[in-house]
Amino acid sequence: SIAKTSATHCLQTLYRTERFPVIILRPFLSYGPGQDSSRFLPQIIKGCLSGKEFETSSGEQIRDFCYIDDITDGILKAMKSDNLNGEIINLASGDPISIRTVIEKVKTYIGKGNPKFGKIPYRVGENMSLYADTSRAERLLGWRSKTTIDDGIKKTVDYYRAYDPQ
């Protein structure tokens, strides 16, 4: 996050001093088919598909997941805009959800899985609430995330069932 903040400041300075054309997009927790299998959602999906116990935190963290097709749509809208130089725009669902709820939704859709909540401690300094204000994306791009977390989970689970057998 320090690197992202530094890059943002650098780009904003370039825009202000040199009129360097830049739009800063901040995608929040993108997920979907083909995502690196070491990431959170693929790990949960694989854990549930296996039907075996798997350890997780208590899941109280609040996050803002955004399906990859929606992120891509937001990026394309920003690229086609002529008057957004210097803007910082969050691309997110705007629907905060707990990690525990996401895990339960995956488990319910798959029909099996045995998460052991509270077995993994939170990371030191973990941000317990991380979600986006999407009002600038709506106002400046006319963009909103279209895919619900339920639909996104289903599409992602279906991908892993078909293309990433255990």
Regions found by a protein language model. Give the residues of each.
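Active-site Tyr-X1-5-Lys
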Residues: 1-23, 49
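Short-chain dehydrogenase/reductase
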Residues: 1-8, 35-42, 64-65, 96
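Helical cap/lid subdomains and adjacent loops of hydrolase enzymes that gate the active-site channel
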Residues: 23, 44-46, 122
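Flexible, glycine-rich beta-alpha linker
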Residues: 23-40
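C-terminal substrate-binding subdomain of Rossmann-fold SDR/epimerase-dehydratase oxidoreductases
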Residues: 48-166
